C-alpha cells in the first residue's frame, strides 16, 4: 500500500515539479503566493494522510508548501493556468489560483462534459465527485497515463525495492519520492487547449506576414534598398548624382543622341518650350538590335537630366498572382507622380507591351498592358512624366502602345557605321594601355557589322589576354586575336583535335568554302580560315565585308548560298558520296533559311511571283492552319529546292575546275592550321608562307622551357670544379 501511495504522490505532483523548473516569475503579492500554496498543500496533504497506511507522510506539509509556492511563481500558473492530470477517460484540472478542481469525462461517441469543484464553478450535487473520493478511486485500481520512461523507472523502482531488506525499504522509498518531487516526472499533461490556440494564432500570424510580403503589401528595407515582396521586385529610383554616365560616354549614335538631348533640354528648361505652346512628349521608344547601346543611352539620360529617374524591366511586371502586374504598374506611376517631373525607363518593354490576345484559358492576361496604356495616356493625364522604353522586337508591340500620345518619339539605334566604329574604338582604347602602332581606323574597317558591345568586348578580351601573357601593353596582335574570338568564337586551347582523319576532312571542307568564296563574284570577302575547333564547329571560314551594307542584292544572296554549299561539295568530290560527314549540317540549315526567305519573302522567284507568304506562318498559334492551296505550297517547295540545287551545281563546277588549288589549300591548312586571306592567296598561287608552322613553334617553346635548367646544371658543374 505504501508503494502505491508513493507512486500516486509522484503522479499528482509531476506537473508541479516541471513547472517549478521554469522560473518565469512575475510581480505578485507574497500573501497571494503563500495563500495559494497553502491551499494546495493542505488538499494534497489531506489526501496522502487519508490513504496512507502509515500515519506519518513521506513528504511533510512544509516541503509541499515550498514546492507549490515555487510553482506559483511560474508565469503560466500566475496567468490562471492549470495542472492537468490524465486518468483513463477522465482529466483532473487543478487551478492553483482559485484552489479549484475540474473533472472532465468523455465517453465513447459522447460530447465532453465538464464538472467543477471549488470556487470557480457551481455544479449540481449529483454531478460532482469529491476530490478525495476521486483520488481514492484512482488509488484503488485506475492507472494514470504516463510516458514510457516513467513506467520503466517505476518498474526499476519496484525491482530494486524487493531486493532490499524491510528495514531499508522505507528509507529507499523516501529518497525516491523526494527525488521525484524535486526533479519532476516527464509525461505530465499540459495545457493542450491553450497551447493549440497559441499555435494556431502564431501560424495564422506567420501566414499573414508571408502573404503580405508575397504581394508587396509589407515591404522590407535592406540597407538603402526597399524590397517589396518575395517574387515582385520594385522599380528602383536612381539618384542622378550617382550616375557617372553622360552623353560624352555615348559613342557611335549621333542621331539618337540628338533626339534624346532635346528631351533632356526640355526637362531642364520647360518654359523655353511651353511659351511657344509645345508640350512635353509622353514617351520615347528606343528601337535597335541587341548591343547597340539603348540601355547605355538611358543611363546617359539619367546622368544628364538631373531629375528623378525610375528604372525597371518589362519582365518584372509578370506576376504570380492575378492582378499583381496591373498593381505594379499603378505603383510605379504613383511613385513617379510624387516626384514629377521625372523619367521612367522600362527595359525590354516587349515583355509587357506585346500584342493583346483573346485567351479563354487566361482571361486576365491583358490587364497589365491595359493598365500601362491607361497610365501613359488615359482619362487622367500624368503631366511631367516621360516614359523611355527600349526593345529590339518592335513588331511584337501593341499598336495602341505605339500611337502618338503614348510613345511620341521613336528613336532608332542602329549598328555603328565606319565613323561610329572609329569613335567607339578611340573611346575604349583610351581606357587601356596599348602600343602606339594601333590605328583605330584599321580596326574599324576590319570590324564591319560589330555593335558597340562587340567592340567593347573585343578591346577587353585583348587587354585580358595581354595581362595573362604578362605583356607590358596591348598590341595589334592581341586585338586581331580578340576580333577572331568575337567573329568565330573561342579557339580550342590545345590546337587541332588529335584525330588526324577528322582534321583531314575538316581541312578539305573548309578549303571548299574558301575557294568558292574566292572565285564567286559577289561573295563576301574572305577574312580567315582555320581547322582549329571554335565553339561547336571543328573548323571555321570567316567572312568580313569591306564596307557597311544596308541592303542585299539577289546576286549577293546567291553567292552566299554557293559558299555555304562549298563544304558539302568538297567532301563529296574528295571522299565520295558514302564518306560525307555531318559537318555540313549547319551550312545546310542556314542555306535553307536563306532560300526560303528569297522565295517566300523577297519575291525572287519568277514562278512564285511577287508575294509575301510569311503572313500564313503564325508561330504563336497552337494549331497552324495554312490558307495556301496545295498547288501553291508544292510550287513554293519546288522553287526552294531549285534554288538550292542550282547553288550546289555552281559550287561543284568551281571545285572541279580548281582541284589543284583545293589540294594545296587543304595541305596548307593541315600544316599551318590557320590562314589569313593573304596567305590563302599565296598558297593557291604556288607561293610559300613565310612563317613557322605551329608544330615548329611548339617545339621551339619546349626547347626554351628546358634551356634554363640546362644552363643552371652547367653552372653548378663549373662551380663544383673550381672548388
From Swiss-Prot:
Pfam family membership, one: AAA
Signal sequence, renumbered to the chain: none
Cofactor: Zn(2+)
Binding site for Zn(2+): 509, 513, 587
Domain of life, source organism: Eukaryota
Membership in a protein family: In the N-terminal section; belongs to the AAA ATPase family. In the C-terminal section; belongs to the peptidase M41 family.
Coiled coil spans: none
Species in which this protein is naturally found: Caenorhabditis elegans
Function recorded in the entry: ATP-dependent metalloprotease that catalyzes the degradation of folded and unfolded proteins with a suitable degron sequence in the mitochondrial intermembrane region. Plays an important role in regulating mitochondrial morphology and function.
Protein name: ATP-dependent zinc metalloprotease YME1 homolog
UniProt keyword Metal-binding present: yes
